[in-house]
Amino acid sequence: MIKEIPEKMTAVYLTGHGGIETLEYRDDIPVPVPGAGEVLIKVSAAGVNNTDINTRIGWYSKKVVDATNTGGAEGFAEVDDADATWSGVAMQFPRIQGADCCGIIVAVGEGVDESRVGQRVLVRNMLRSYVDYRPYECWTLGSECDGAFAQY
């Protein structure tokens, strides 16, 4: 049975590139509303993926040339937010990370069959998306868009 969806949720915000000090635990984040073709998932479990760490430390920025073990704890000084996501689009802060998740669909947007509400789902964290002139770029949950380190 699906309970009423609250207006606010708990989430972990990534406030910038760097070490773990850039992560902020918050309980005042608005619950997202699904748009057309989207679903809202109540997160049951979320795992830490290397994408979450690499996004936090800024390793995807084209200016970073060192290995991840060089800046893995504190991040990289040469990060450029303009290209620091998996796909190379500008990084937007704050960002809710969390590339891997499973949960239950609790709401659907326009064009999605309402019978999906209540279904358990495992989220594919990497989607193909058109970015600039590259038609098959990787769009990653928790990097290009908010992810699963939240209740919804």
Where do the PLM segments sit?
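Glycine-rich beta-strand-centered segment in the early N-terminal region that forms part
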Residues: 30-46, 60-130
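Short, P/G- and charge-enriched loop/turn segments at secondary-structure junctions
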Residues: 88-94, 137-143, 149
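Cytochrome P450 core scaffold surrounding the K-helix E-X-X-R motif
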Residues: 51-57, 132
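A structural motif shared across PLP-dependent enzymes of the aminotransferase-like
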Residues: 129-131, 144-152
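Short, Lys/Arg- and Gly-enriched loop/turn segments at beta-strand edges
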Residues: 128-138
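Short N-terminal binding/cap micro-motifs at the start of the first secondary-structure element
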Residues: 18-23, 50-51
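Basic/polar N-terminal segments that are highly enriched at the extreme N-terminus
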Residues: 1-10, 15
